[in-house]
Amino acid sequence: MQTTAQQQALSLQNPCVAFMFSYQQKDLSKMLELCDSSGTVEFVPLGEAGKGKIGELGKTIWGLLIDCFPDIDNTLDAAVAEDSNTVRCQVVIRGTQEKDFADIPNQGKHFDSDHIFIFHLNQNHKIDHIRVWWNHDDFKRQLGA
């Protein structure tokens, strides 16, 4: 039998797990539906250029990843409720490049990269902030850049 705290933690994880599943399905619309329309995103390795609105910068980057890496996939290794509104997901993302991506010319190479997504949910259980970390130098190295 689950405790109330365990049930709350599972409930909190659901939008975040659903977001990662939607990403795995390449369903950008569903990913964005799980987010607050005024939510923010930080792709930490990109510095200031990696900060913006989920529905603008997030939509653009995830859309480009799905387009340039059509076999993109992810494995959710862990989802941990850090507090009542925050979930940390440990994810492995992989894919084979088929188009130029940002400053990385297409060489048809494959990447396999550990990522950390930290999701914050608002009172309406919508994702209102996402912070994403990965080793960008290793990502570029795997793609031959």
Language-model features: locations:
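Short solvent-exposed loop/turn micro-motifs enriched in small/polar/acidic residues
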Residues: 14, 71-73, 111-113
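Hydrophobic/aromatic beta-strand elements that line small-molecule binding cavities or substrate pockets
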Residues: 75-80, 114-120, 131
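A solvent-exposed, acidic/Ser-Thr-rich amphipathic alpha-helical stretch
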Residues: 9-10, 30-87
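Short, low-complexity N-terminal intrinsically disordered segments enriched in polar/charged residues
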Residues: 1-37, 41
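Low-complexity, intrinsically disordered terminal/linker segments enriched in charged
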Residues: 126-145
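Short beta-strand segments enriched in hydrophobic/aromatic residues
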Residues: 35, 93-95, 133-134
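Exposed beta-sheet edge and beta->alpha loop/turn motif
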Residues: 92-123
